[in-house]
Design a protein with these regions (language model features):
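Core alpha/beta structural scaffold of self-assembling particle/tube/pore-forming proteins
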Residues: 1-57, 68-70, 76-89, 93-350
């Protein structure tokens, strides 16, 4: 009898098409889905030049134009890669015992590999909004439940989406990891398997992530303007903190819809043309309620199978799609001109 698919099944690999992985990765992560991708980031680093000033040899007086001339202002960010790993470990007996519809609802290999892909995806999607430090939350309150357990309340409840049962955490500068035993997603509280030694206001990291993660929007568009000691991928952005480090607009004293229009006007003043604004679901709900019957919804399509529902607002340089993203920090909106943003990776990410 010839070797056939039935007898050789144990040696065959589970096949994942690019389309399947894309669907798993993008469906709940709008910014990750919508940002342009460059997947050939080889070599040691990548030089990203930016022109932030034009020649200043100009005057109504020729002699002054000549004597005051300057060259164009250029700086180059030197990008480097970050690694991130997600492991799926499956005992061979489990793989064999779960094969076929009669033996299990889901084959073990598919179940666990899908989970690892989702873990890597969540890490990347969260990091795209981060500053590179790896912080996924801040301790708001801490209580020792027993001699061997700590109950941690997050400073921002909405950050609870960044945490999972079984996750190993570090707090502040400590390198001893503690595991999450249980989570209350309504209150932003989780219980650890041991006393953490953490204090309030300390940042929280997945074990091994501190200062090792991709630099996302919070790094490229910092909430505080870069100062004289700034060094960001080899660039001191303080020479023009707006053109090299983005625009900061404080709309905390304004109604949300007015804050967004004000931010759009501020970006337009600097020559930008924002077309998408990412916000947290909590803030998106506030915007829906504030607009009431005036709300105008828009569907943002990434491909025929993946799309997101947003709200359309009108800025001074055109319509802006406000899209909710669970990975965006609460109380922060990122208003972007999408054609100037790109995710660089060595192969597909994740």
């Amino acid at each position: 009898m010839a070797l056939n698919m039935t007898t050789f099944a144990a040696a065959l690999k589970q096949h994942y098409t690019d389309e399947k992985i894309e669907n798993m990765v993008y469906k709940d992560n709008p910014f990750l889905a919508m940002v342009s991708k460059y997947e050939d980031f080889g070599g040691e680093n990548l030089k990203l030049p930016v022109k932030y000033g034009i020649p200043m040899g100009r005057s109504a007086t020729f002699a002054d134009a000549v004597s005051n001339k300057t060259a164009s202002q250029l700086k180059a960010f030197l990008l480097t890669r970050n690694s991130d790993y997600a492991i799926a470990s499956i005992a061979n007996e489990t793989i064999e015992a779960s094969k076929g519809n009669a033996n299990a609802f889901i084959e073990a290999a598919t179940f666990e590999i899908d989970g690892a892909i989702e873990s890597a995806t969540r890490s990347l999607a969260i990091s795209l909004y981060g500053d590179g430090s790896g912080s996924i939350g801040v301790v708001g309150a801490l209580a020792t439940t027993t001699a061997s357990n700590d109950t941690v309340t997050l400073a921002t409840i909405q950050d609870i989406t960044n945490f999972e049962v079984g996750m190993q955490l570090n707090f502040g500068t400590a390198t001893t990891n503690k595991k999450i035993d249980s989570i209350n997603r309504d209150t932003g509280v989780f219980i650890l398997d041991a006393a953490s030694g953490a204090t309030t206001t300390e940042a929280i990291y997945v074990d091994g992530d501190k200062d090792n993660m991709l630099t996302g929007l919070a790094g490229w568009l910092p909430s505080t303007a870069p100062g004289s000691t700034d060094s960001f991928f080899g660039v001191n952005r303080s020479s023009d903190s707006t053109r090299l480090g983005g625009i900061r607009f404080d709309g905390s004293s304004l109604p949300l819809e007015e804050a967004l229009i004000g931010a759009a006007a501020r970006v337009a003043r600097e020559g930008g043309k924002p077309d998408v604004c990412f916000i947290n679901y909590n803030n998106f709900g506030d915007l829906e309620k504030a607009l009431g019957s005036k709300v105008s919804y828009v569907d943002v399509k990434v491909n025929p199978e993946i799309g997101f529902r947003g709200i359309l607002i009108h800025g001074p340089r055109g319509p802006i799609k406000v899209v909710p993203d669970q990975n965006c920090p609460n109380g922060v909106a990122y208003m972007l001109q999408m054609d100037v943003w790109k995710l660089y990776s060595l192969g597909k990410a994740p």
